[in-house]
Amino acid sequence: IEQRIYDGMEGRTFYRPKTISPINCTNVLIEGITMERSTLWNVVPIYCENVIIRGITVNSTKVPSGDGIDIESCKNVLIEYCTLNCGDDCFTLKAGRAEDGLRVGKPTENVVIRYSLAQHGHGGITCGSETAGVIKNLYVHDCVFDGTRTGIRFKTRRNRGGGSDNTYYERLRMINVGKAFTWDLLGSAYYMGELAARYPARKVNRLTPDVKNILIKDFIVESADQFFTANGIPEIPFNQVVVENGEIKCKKLIGALNDAAGFTMRKLTIEAQHNDIHILDGKDILFEDIHFKLPAGEIMVNVEGERSGNIVFKNINANQEKVEYKKESPMRIEIK
């Protein structure tokens, strides 16, 4: 709690106020308003139940940390027909941070985000990095991300706790985004210190995040710098991820698929300028029914890590496949 005192006293930063923030409320309706040049986050329900946010517009592109909508530890939330143009993340879901979040013990659950537009912003839909209470049962559909730094973004850290379960995304369109899909459980050394180092694997405890059961389907990425990147943690890898039925145009393919178990990409058409796929300690990985349009028609797959295994490429159209292994990686990849 002491870390969250921003009263401007004794050299501390002054805490900028949120624009609209109902706390511990039931049956909340926020509809048809426009917010311009806010001081911080715009719409922030906290510990609420039965929330509808409909048809709002946010313009806060030059506001540091100018999030659009932040849902924190709420239950039964519907967000629809919103247009967000933000200085930070557009649509954000949080569930408490570290020990304080575990003490409160309130998840963010049963959330639907639909028929909405995210324009300028760090992330179109962002989960985290506060995830202690767990973000679960999230359904995002029929949304457009135009010019955001990332499309779908998940971030948490080793000491944040919780994680996510049952997050579903479908019928999405992305235009001029940086990274289309990104998951990051490590963070940077600047903020996390030695916890940002992937190894050594830490002992699993109550603050170890667990991210599982992710479905992404029926989407179009018209233009992106990178299609997909995922940096997990070795102590609890990503588990059960499916990405299917998509059309992608990007510069880079998969920058990192690290510490993942049960990961499937299938029924995709991918046009990319670079042909690299990097896998580190990935197990039970399947790429199936994928039509690649790549330089020289070949895929460069770089596999590392002693735990990498059962990596299968099936029914892909690339003319030839190149696979590179580090010395510690046994050859556990199959191309059919």
Can you name each region flagged by the protein language model?
Residues 1-336:
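Extracellular/periplasmic carbohydrate-active domains that bind, remodel
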